[in-house]
Design a protein with these regions (language model features):
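Non-catalytic substrate-recognition and accessory regions of acyl/acetyltransferase enzymes
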Residues: 1-147, 155, 162-174, 181, ...
């Protein structure tokens, strides 16, 4: 068996660009960059942790009661707060992995790592597996403040889907194992929950059918 080759350092490519609308209604350009890049992953760690600290401070200032603070925290998806993006970049740097970072306003507010190929559970053909995908804390639903940007998870998954079809020659569709609080997002995308394919941590398996993946890919 041939050992997977390492990603080429510096082989970054801007694959998509567009415009986001802030909560303030201001328009902000964004770009999605494909490629393995330790710097981008480290930026996610540093800037996102600063964002979490700022959010926790905001919660304490907005609500002095600790019980209500806990209720506010429970409204936020924090299950991935321990993720180490730099460590993931070190661990997942061979050719079967593809990295995507979304940049807006000089910061990376979304990141995604996919693995390929992966056999579909819903039909014939190979698709890709979403190893990790997340958005920055200031773009998550929270009871005490508006998200800066909305829809970044869908935007970066759409870009990954387009890349997979065009460059990797995979058929439309992707799958993943979802963190519990993220299941609602994937259900909203109309992904299918497939029983019996849970992972070692009992996380549910979801897959986007080919027809719906094509619609996602073709959406503006």
């Amino acid at each position: 068996m041939t050992k997977p080759s390492k990603k080429k350092i510096g082989s970054l490519q801007e694959i998509e660009q567009g415009e986001l609308t802030q909560a303030s209604k201001n328009k902000v350009p964004y770009k999605i960059v494909h490629g393995w890049d330790l710097k981008s992953s480290l930026q996610c760690d540093i800037i996102w942790k600063e964002g979490w600290l700022a959010l926790f401070k905001q919660i304490q200032q907005a609500e002095p009661d600790e019980t209500k603070q806990d209720e506010i925290l429970a409204s936020i998806s924090t299950e991935d707060i321990h993720w180490d993006w730099f460590g993931k970049a070190v661990d997942y740097c061979t050719d079967e992995y593809e990295w995507f970072h979304l940049y807006a306003d000089g910061k990376p507010p979304a990141a995604c790592l996919i693995y390929h190929p992966e056999e579909s559970a819903l039909g014939p053909g190979d698709i890709f597996y979403v190893k990790f995908v997340a958005v920055a804390p200031w773009n998550r639903k929270c009871d005490i403040r508006l998200r800066e940007f909305r829809g970044l998870g869908e935007i970066i998954l759409r870009a990954a889907q387009r890349f997979a079809v065009k460059e990797l020659k995979l058929r439309p569709g992707f799958c993943l194992h979802s963190l519990p609080k993220a299941e609602g997002f994937y259900t909203k995308l109309k992904m299918v929950k497939v029983d019996g394919k849970e992972d070692a941590e009992s996380l549910a398996y979801f897959e986007l059918p080919e027809e719906l993946a094509t619609q996602l890919m073709e959406a503006s």
